[in-house]
């Protein structure tokens, strides 16, 4: 039976007990009812110790999980295809499915066996989707997993996103053209959009796209849902009024999240409105080109994040990743972070961090070791899905807070003072955890041993019955041996037959009259007595009652801890921030970074700047200065390929970005004026998914810069125009450079191989020529990587080609053509004549045979003996 058949069965048989339903077995009737409510989602249907999947779900799961597909029995005359996974290993299978973008409905057994006629009652307990994960086994501990809803109205993009694993809910409105930039910033795991909205770009940007009914995106409903959830009359306290498109997205998001969890989201305690002006604008191309958290090849390292992430906790790593994608416009907040980093690193403002003075940093990082993911544990407490070991880890983490207080001492930096106050130990919560949770609890409540001894008298009594079992059996064995006269009599227990007295066949004639046979073995008989039976009932009952009592106590414990959720969230945020700032301080100490300075004067002034990632990959990295100001708005950068132009430009952008996220920077000094955005146009490749060529991608990115850059924007333009013909490219590069100088008036680093552009500074004094030089030494090119004033003398493109292994004959032909081009006037003719007008050979001029022979030599292909022979031949020619 496929999905279409299931849907038909559900449609035909809406009334329970209808004629069509009677054709299925009672269990399959129950399955079909649940499946009809979730037709597009895999259904894990609990049956004893397994979660079973049926029909098309079984085939799909077997294919994705590489599990066995089988057929068992029939329903309505159709063989039932099925596959299953053991319940104790379900999380690992769920993790694999979620990584593949699948969603799963979990239907648990909620009734007691035999309590009702027919199959045991089952109900959906949760829905697992890529954007609504909270279980540690399903999440990447260093990456936030976001659920995002997006809708569009009259050119305004409304976004709402929720990190269900910590309760962080945010909304924003922005122009529709920022869709790609926002998706690149947030990287949602799952996206919700209205069914009637055509957003083809979303489909290419999101791995998991879910279309919901248009009516679910309703601003009025969004406001009602949120005010009811927060218990407020309106959303003015969250500064969320006047955002109808964002609230429409929030309506769909919040309802969807609640439906997957099957409960209220009490850990969502606030709503944050993000505004465009909060952060430096980084478009999608800039985030990729600067390789903040992912290389251009899609790898995790080497990136700025991989360099800086020395965080002790997973919370700190997530804070750091978020910070790198959200450079602050509020320079006061960024400066507060600088102050905290400086105090942790033991550095005065403007001076490089000194490893010898970083005593506070070492103490703080030592105190953070052993701190668990308080952020996500708190969310699981709110959702009542926290495991016993989560609570033990939370208890240990809270117990370390006094050590962290001692490590911070009496800080001077205002931000450190705020963090110190935020990590105040919630004594009631810690006391409750210490008293209630066993030191080393079992993985699951069903296994017992979760609640600590002494916490509950009734549980202790029930456990006492179980623990005294051995003593009772030993005493009973001694008494029964004396009573029966059977010296080899044994009193034992197993899970199948319970308690019994074992007597060998040779002694069965001696057993007392009150012995009742329980089992016959080859060499012995097993008996039970009224006394032993009474104890068995009591012991086994005590075990069941103890487990039931422990489950009840655990649920009550989660309920009690839920009252501390706001305090635990405050602590988690502070720990994450402190750990992230510690990573900034660690980088400053290890790599000699300095505190950047903010200035009210426009411009960028960097002395001895370095690329933070590249300098760790190479030896003897060459630092460079960069000065941009109102009288020096554009640096026109020329120089050879591989000379370091792109590295120089990227390092300027990264230094600016690091300063605005609150980190120290790789330079001897850095002073930055006001910035509102960083744009980059560096490199390009075909966008096959969107049907765009390399040149189209290049022009699209350039267009975004020309339309979006302001006087306070930092713009990086690398070899614009190279994707088309020489004259077209030169014309475009010239026009774009002039537009940036005249219209945008932004701070620009403009790298080019078009030397004609170096004449721009004749018309625009604010355009300065700089170059990265190279020299030829011993017939090889040596890149100096130092930025010098003035234009470059040549590009050394042919020499770089030779370094890349281009055959010598090709290199020689290229040099010959280059000389011919340099020795003639190109004029204003069409580019097609550039090579067509060249003769196949240079004009014939008398030359010595020895010179001709020497020109034809390729020394790289000669053996020592052949080289010596050619040398003697040349000598003879000149004799």
UniProtKB/Swiss-Prot annotation:
Residues where ATP binds: 639-646
This protein's UniProt keywords: ATP-binding, DNA damage, DNA repair, DNA-binding, Nucleotide-binding
GO cellular component: cytosol
InterPro entries from the UniProt entry: DNA_mismatch_repair_MutS (IPR005748), DNA_mismatch_repair_MutS-lik_N (IPR007695), DNA_mismatch_repair_MutS/MSH (IPR017261), DNA_mismatch_repair_MutS_C (IPR000432), DNA_mismatch_repair_MutS_clamp (IPR007861), DNA_mismatch_repair_MutS_core (IPR007696), DNA_mismatch_repair_MutS_N (IPR016151), DNA_mismatch_repair_MutS_sf (IPR036187)
Any GO MF annotation of the entry: damaged DNA binding
CDD domains: ABC_MutS1
Domain of life: Bacteria
One biological process term in Gene Ontology: mismatch repair
Pfam families: MutS_I, MutS_II, MutS_III, MutS_IV, MutS_V
HAMAP family listed in its UniProt record: MutS
Entry's family note: Belongs to the DNA mismatch repair MutS family.
Function (record text): This protein is involved in the repair of mismatches in DNA. It is possible that it carries out the mismatch recognition step. This protein has a weak ATPase activity.
Protein name in UniProt: DNA mismatch repair protein MutS
Originating species: Aromatoleum aromaticum (strain DSM 19018 / LMG 30748 / EbN1) (Azoarcus sp. (strain EbN1))
